[in-house]
Design a protein with these regions (language model features):
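Flexible loop/turn segments at secondary-structure boundaries
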Residues: 68-69, 89-90, 114, 174-178, ...
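A cytosolic small-molecule/anion-sensing beta-strand core signal
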Residues: 55, 228, 236
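Short, glycine/charge-rich flexible loops or terminal/linker lids adjacent to PRPP-binding catalytic cores
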Residues: 186-233, 242-246
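Short acidic/polar active-site loop segments enriched in Thr and Asp
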Residues: 165, 258
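Alpha-helix capping and helix-loop boundary segments enriched in small/acidic/polar residues
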Residues: 15, 143, 147, 207, ...
């Protein structure tokens, strides 16, 4: 409403609502330069909003003021790259050189990286990166994803007093936790549920609940031979909407799991 009152016009829609990219672009263009424009975005947008802007003088990268979503800069001879997922760098021969801090704004050219706005100290980063959404080889602010998941499993095993025949993880992100649990508990790790990869990567992303249920059923295939008559610990981090959790419990019993 504030932008409309100033005479700005919205020409794009996304899923029947205001296009987020256009809204952010208008908030930036409402100020005199990119830095104050991005600061305007930080002030007006309540959620997390990290940005990459392609300008005539290079790329401007900005991490949201809370640091919830990562922005990582990598370098190789003669070029820079910016990504929210550092696992994209190694196979392209880039080396990570800088984790952009919360609220920090930098300008990148082929030859240099210039800080336009310093980072703030407060950073309630989203822990979901390490638990679920991050790629195992990635590191966010110096903490490796797979190591974090493995350590989570170790801690769970140390606090858990149940007896089980083996531990399994719901793939993919539950696998690292299951491996850590197996190490901490001293029991085998088995692949009692395997993911059928040519489906949706995330079962919580479809907007329709019936589609989410269908994807959940298609996505994971239990191994009856391993489950039958066994006491099994399952490490399942996929609890965004609970779609996988409710299905998995009933399926495990249907396939013969004892406990």
């Amino acid at each position: 409403k504030e932008l409309l009152d100033k005479g700005h016009h919205f020409s794009e829609l996304s899923s029947g609502s205001t296009n987020q990219s256009e809204l952010i672009a208008l908030l930036i263009s409402d100020k005199d330069d990119f830095v104050t424009g991005i600061e305007n975005v930080f002030t007006k947008i309540k959620g997390s909003c990290s940005l990459l802007l392609l300008t005539e003088n290079g790329i401007i990268a900005a991490r949201d003021k809370w640091g919830r979503t990562p922005v990582i800069v990598a370098k190789k001879e003669g070029s820079y790259a910016v990504s929210s997922e550092p696992s994209s760098f190694p196979n392209l021969d880039f080396e990570t050189v800088h984790d952009v801090g919360p609220g920090e704004i930098i300008q990148i050219t082929a030859d240099d990286m210039i800080r336009l706005r310093p980072a703030t100290k407060e950073m309630p980063i989203c822990s979901f990166l390490w638990v679920y959404s991050g790629y195992p080889t990635s590191e966010y602010d110096g903490v490796n994803v797979d190591t974090a998941r493995y350590n989570n499993g170790m801690i769970m095993a140390e606090k858990d007093d149940i007896e089980a025949d083996f531990v399994a993880g719901i793939p993919d992100s539950g696998t690292g936790m299951a491996l850590g649990y197996a190490e901490g508990k001293g029991i085998p790790h088995r692949r009692a549920i395997v993911k059928y990869t040519p489906t949706w990567p995330r079962s919580f992303t479809p907007a329709n609940q019936s589609v989410r249920d269908l994807v959940a059923r298609m996505k994971l295939i239990p191994n009856r031979h391993l489950l039958s008559g066994k006491r099994v610990v399952f490490c399942d981090d996929s609890i965004v909407r609970g779609t996988q959790l409710s299905d998995n419990v009933s399926i495990l019993y249907d396939y013969g799991a004892k406990e």
